[in-house]
Amino acid sequence: MALRELEFTSHNGTDTIQAWVYEPAVTPVAVVQLIHGLGEHSRRYLHMTAALVDAGFVVVADDHAGHGRTAMQSGTWGDAGDESATVIVQDEVTLYRKAKELFPDLPYVVFGHSLGSMIARALVLQPGVEVDGLALGGIAVGMRGVESTLDREALKAAVAADGSAPAADALVGQLFDGFLDRFAAARARGFEAVEYLFPYAFPAC
């Protein structure tokens, strides 16, 4: 396996996106653009990347603005800037274009997990983006129960604020209500692995 490191300026104009190209030792059969989820980074998928490369695929992946090595370099965590959804999608468009320049004749597949599945769906709808396959995992569609649990007035106030202060823990808890229930239940039953992993469970989104 050969590894290339790429950098490019984020759509937000401030971050330098860190990206990687993993190439097989054999003639490649296709490119897979891997898009990670909320609060994680692309190297969380190294086991999947290794399996794909062993099967002859090129894998391209980056760490979103506010995530992973990109955030380590900028010092800004969890914040892609104004219009963050647009920023992250356009950064994936940039990575797509760079990959197509490197491998113009190979079939192209996009894979996204959780938030990455939402980004992947937006990516393939962008002008000039043509793919041969779309694979989605941990598909995020809506937030279960948010209609009844969310304090909408508190959310409006948080959105209207200048953004210098983080959202209240209670509000964040309402937004992600139910996401960790299965971990909490297993922890209560004394599962040691879950006890160890529980502090890191949230990045699995």
What residue spans do the PLM features occupy?
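Flexible "cap/lid" loop of the alpha/beta hydrolase fold
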Residues: 125, 133-163
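Conserved alpha/beta-hydrolase
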Residues: 42, 49-75
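Alpha/beta-hydrolase
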Residues: 157-205
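Short glycine-enriched nucleophile-adjacent loop
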Residues: 117-128
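Alpha/beta-hydrolase fold nucleophile elbow
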Residues: 103-114
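Active-site glycine-rich loops that stabilize anionic/oxyanionic intermediates
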Residues: 37-40
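N-terminal cap/lid segment of alpha/beta-hydrolase-fold proteins
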Residues: 1-26
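Alpha/beta-hydrolase active-site loop
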Residues: 81-100
